């Protein structure tokens, strides 16, 4: 009886016994678990060989022929041929597998004897059935948090020679199984051969970052502050931890940080932490390598230094000063606070109308709550003096014409310098009602 059909085609010949049917390149092939046994669906007829064209048996309903192709002739009509094979006779012998790791690929080599399942069709053309094989192995895959085992498979045609596989990142058995569907349909165990990869050479990494956040209402006046650990841009100081997350075969690490085209940092640790201060665009280039894959030539298939680029952007400094605040306890505008980003220095002094210093502070995230020595200050105009340095200011920049004291009139004008803030002006304290 017909055990299973991998693909069904309409023929006038059927197989008898444990067998299965396959359609390949338009031809119908029968594979038998033991001897070939064919039966006509149109009653007794003449049986012919597709290979020789010779009559095999006349006026017969069933035949037990050798492997090959056969067609029926009845009443002068030739019917579509079939091609029959005793499957166990085509089992590979002496088949061995060896696996060779490289940086960008893995080679699997099969040696031994694989008998060809060949036949001559009704047109006299020689054909060979392409036997399917599946190559399976375990490698590593990134699941957004870590490397985990992942079973990979590759469909190929069974042959001797070398197969090229993807890079394999962990030790594993590489299993080659062939004719799975045919063997299953015949109730047989599919044959296989195993090669063991003990020392993978392939490497890669999956860098991740964690940015130190500055959240909360106490810093709500900082523009572009990093509120989430995933951000890669914002107000300085921007502190970011970089993690390589390498595959097991990685031996060496390289981190290079470029500000524009200038290399400013180079480290060889697996994980690093860096605080970005100067505004602008940065490139963080991470490379991994090992003794087998030491170079970065993308043309060389046997050499790899897997590099990943991460882009970071630091905001330019900015400092804005309000001219009024209302410390009445309603939760809105209750403090005199500047709006800022990317500052490395800050100092603010508050004077009353008589020039007396009433408050000062050095953290731009903080401000004046409108009290003097713990008591509410009188409503009216006050005077502020601010000096601050942005992270984009020249390291040798100096303040000009500002002292920590009040002088009636305007402050002396100074040469405009990027990132240097020398500000002064009136601030109006209005209490009103909540």
Regions found by a protein language model. Name each.
Residues 4-6:
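N-terminal signal peptide c-region/cleavage motif recognized by signal peptidases
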Residues 10-38, 44-47, 51-52, 57-319, ...:
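Extracellular/lumenal mature domains of secreted and surface-exposed proteins
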Residues 239-243, 291-292, 310-434:
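Short loop/turn motifs at secondary-structure boundaries
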